Amino acid sequence: MASCVVKNWQGETVGSAELSLKVARPETASHILYLALRRQMTNARQGNAHTKTRAEVRGGGRKPWRQKGTGRARAGSIRSPLWRKGGVIFGPRKREYNLAMNRKERQLALRTALQSRVEDLIVVEDFQDQLNPPKTRAVAQALLRWGVMEDQSALLIVAERSEAVERAVRNIARVKLIGLDQLNVFDLLNVDWVLITTSALEKLKARWGSGAAAAAPTQADRLEDQAQAAEREARPVEQAEGQSQEQEEQAEAQAQPEAPPAQADQANQVALANPQVQETQEEELAQAQEREVQGQAELAQEAEPLAQPPAGEEAETAAAEEEDND
């Protein structure tokens, strides 16, 4: 838990405020801040740099001269990257610079960055009523009273942005005004001083303070989550299409499923309970057995002539045996 001073519009110290946020462990704090900074700075890139290749440059469809016989180097197009006004090799192309980060990690990095600036944090009382009419000179003098020198930068965090405060601050280049819902890691770490109003601090403590309930996602978090979900849906779904095709084939193969065993048993029981059905089954079984017996008899008759040798061969065999005996 850390404490910071509370100052009024005249620059007088009127009290102190405590700030206790759930932050990352010391051994991982620098890495989580690095990830959040890299994500924020990368997502800020537009990625509009784009060059044309030799296929996109206008012209160059005709071969400048014939392949052989001129004594000159071979050339197939006047828009070759080697030629003047030709295409560009490996130039920048339009692309999306998007890095995703879990919502809880983003919130942890934000709390860690804010808690790390406690020594440079100044709580000021709400001064919206003092800007009537809004004057840049009044805010510049108040910054000096609060301890922000002319060569130092500051981040002013308010609960809700008002037209009076914006008009009074927008012409001071070294001061950046943001609402509590616009809090980000880069702005917290990129200034010399962090100024926050008392109303913004109370909302911040109610949202992220120790003992507070789990923070609900802000509108920016919801928009980013929706963008990430849309990006995931836009990615190629070849694997999903292959799986769906396999599922369709399996569904077609199983279009005519076999009857369950319970249903088959039930059908057999119904057939046995009907005498006519039972007699028909017995007759079919007897006919099948008769056909099987007849087929076996026919096969036996066909095999008998093949097993007996011819009569002439029997006589020759007998004569040969008698000669051997003599």
From Swiss-Prot:
Gene3D superfamilies referenced in this protein's UniProt entry, alphabetically: 3.40.1370.10
Keyword Ribosomal protein recorded: yes
Compositionally biased spans, kind Basic residues: 60-71
Region (Unknown): 212-326
One Gene Ontology term, aspect cellular component: ribonucleoprotein complex
Region (Large ribosomal subunit protein uL4): 1-211
One Gene Ontology term of the molecular function aspect: rRNA binding
Family: Belongs to the universal ribosomal protein uL4 family.
Function noted in UniProt: One of the primary rRNA binding proteins, this protein initially binds near the 5'-end of the 23S rRNA. It is important during the early stages of 50S assembly. It makes multiple contacts with different domains of the 23S rRNA in the assembled 50S subunit and ribosome.
PANTHER family, sorted: 50S RIBOSOMAL PROTEIN L4 (PTHR10746), LARGE RIBOSOMAL SUBUNIT PROTEIN UL4C (PTHR10746:SF17)
UniProt-recorded name of the protein: Large ribosomal subunit protein uL4
Originating species: Synechococcus sp. (strain JA-3-3Ab) (Cyanobacteria bacterium Yellowstone A-Prime)
